[in-house]
Amino acid sequence: TIEFEERMYAVGRIPGSFNRREGKPSERGILNSRIIDRPMRPLFDEELRNDTVVTCTVLANDYDNPVEIVASLGASISIASSDVPWNGPVATTNVCHIGGEYIVNPSADQRAAADCFVCIASTFEKVVMIETEANEAPEGVVLEAIRIAHETNMEIVKFINSIVAEIGKPKFTFEKAAVNHELLDDLMN
């Protein structure tokens, strides 16, 4: 489970009147937690029964740099260097296409002006999540943006692996639950 907590003070505001407490996540917080969770979840062993929770708390935000990218990388580094068995790491990169040029991790203004924007999460070997906003962009433009993002992610994954090699803990082992085949056959019939 990924929890994305964006405190109001991170953007220079203090909640007033009705919403004095920051009890529930904002819509943006929910979407950011999904961007982090979607590529990470399939990389866990499906028989792992231990709850794993990553909490990303935004302490400062400047609206120009995508906080979900930094939070995604932080979550990936924390799980990869922990003792939790996981088939990561994963990296996330934004790429946009403006006027024939590709920009990696664009600013908010560049993203708004782009005719194609992709958010790609990938391991070293493969792409595991694609999120795209393409205003009738040609297929070749979108595919090139995906390729650039994946190549960038491969470099980031190498960096994460170097961190894990220095500070990573050995992964714990767990017993996989035995399947009761008689019960399974009864349920299927």
Please name every model-derived segment:
Residues M8-Y9, A60, G100, E136:
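Conserved nucleotide-binding/hydrolysis micro-motifs of P-loop NTPases
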Residues S17-R20, V70, A108-D109:
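Short intrinsically disordered coil segments
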Residues T1-T52, V58, N65, F124, ...:
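Glycine-rich, flexible beta-strand/loop modules in the N-terminal catalytic cores of phosphate-handling
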Residues L31, I36, E46-H97:
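Glycine-rich anion/phosphate-binding loop at the beta-strand->alpha-helix junction
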Residues Y9-R21, A60-N65, I167-M188:
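Short, surface-exposed loop/turn segments at secondary-structure boundaries that line and modulate
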Residues D83-N189:
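Mobile "lid/hinge" segments at catalytic clefts and subdomain interfaces of large enzymes
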